[in-house]
């Protein structure tokens, strides 16, 4: 079975011609490039046998440098040396300044509220910085492979939302890359481990990098990779370990950095200390006029809450997947931060088994991406690997009464397309507003708005006669497109969802938790809203009928009786007693039964007026 080859980009009709393709692990701290060469998947190394390329760009007066050269400028020129741009991508300036107040950069806001970093070469967006990194990786890969790349697979955290994924694709396009696919980092690791070890069963992929954390629960069976559930934190990683350790060192030295250069030097020292403590139980540290010893135990205490935070996310992912901890067959460790002994110990205790670390955790994602790229570019058309990712949050549409109708439920396998049919609410309605929502709650006010568009040109008919088919489609990169079409005329409108910025980790967590804690209240609110909608429809229908035929077929007393029932139902509708509203609808229906019969008789009389008996028969 081919890997979702229905219409994968990058594939051609000439499968026997070997094409150059690479997998790019675009990391927060470091990036890597890997490729399949002579049947072997390898990470590309530079002239000094180094695999890791720092995800750093330095914008100098005369030139721009990327990678190791740029990283060397971090302490010398911190305001023009952009590190961890991946943390900023797809976020608003307000979010960035709140979340990362200690960054040494000078920010200004773009027209749509996104952050721009002021550098010697002008204002740079996180997308442009990422594009510069990708351009560097592209040149490096083409130099190593000796030819032009036909396509790339770029990995992203599984919990990246639409804005962050789209921003990553925009960066790749700016860099001139042909993106075959965006691939979730944990899924890429599963590909690498699944092909190497042939494991089957449920596995957990614990991915703790420099700036992001992801957990994925996957089922591996007969070459099929199915993601059962994902969870993550887009603002948790090894960088946070560094900041905690840096603060501790500053406190011990009784000295706070006085400028951006000293702050960068302190962070560099903290990173070096963290790495040393992964090998030794204690290490010497010198900062300002202070010299002392930091033990692994002290470091463990500093990062304990952050590690526990990651394990809470793991617990939610297990619940979402519907599996117990003991069902996990293997735990795959991904990301350089999983080298920290305390992280490995805590993860091992949580899952009750020793984590897998046989593949270099820094390289495993790039290796999996390279395998995927080799298939998508057409070099392995007979591959039997099937990869199934999932939608992390439900996608829905607003309906009458401020309700949310879920079109694609959370954890549906992607790519996926789902459609539902809706109708008009008013007589003569010629347009319909489509409000696209994301979240797990029942009411619009409790979900996240992704976008709106209007379908115009609906033929004017009585309410409920027109049929509008709304289709939601999530592609392999997790990007959403929504189309609304009126079935009789085929008139349609659509939207490609590209939010201006992404969800914070707190918002993602809250959206999931609140759907559980408020489930009962949400359902009661939904039932009340649905009853109010039914009341509105009944009232509108009766008022329209009265305007058309009431004066002709009803006595004054009958007319007033129906008006009184309408007024009563309008009053009941303002309250919160669902049963009372339902009874009001029944009372109005009962009060209009005679009116309905008289309207039917009147309609028959008008239809037969002036016609001979033989014409009717």
From Swiss-Prot:
Pfam families: HSP70. GO terms for biological process: iron-sulfur cluster assembly. The keyword Transcription regulation does not apply. The keyword Disulfide bond does not apply. CDD domains: ASKHA_NBD_HSP70_HscA (cd10236). Keywords: ATP-binding, Chaperone, Nucleotide-binding. One of its GO terms (molecular function) is ATP hydrolysis activity. It comes from the Bacteria. InterPro entries: ATPase_NBD, Heat_shock_70_CS, HscA_NBD, HSP70_C_sf, HSP70_peptide-bd_sf, Hsp_70_fam, ISC_FeS_clus_asmbl_HscA. Chaperone involved in the maturation of iron-sulfur cluster-containing proteins. Has a low intrinsic ATPase activity which is markedly stimulated by HscB. Belongs to the heat shock protein 70 family. This is Chaperone protein HscA homolog. It comes from Actinobacillus pleuropneumoniae serotype 5b (strain L20). The lineage of its organism: Bacteria, Pseudomonadati, Pseudomonadota, Gammaproteobacteria, Pasteurellales.
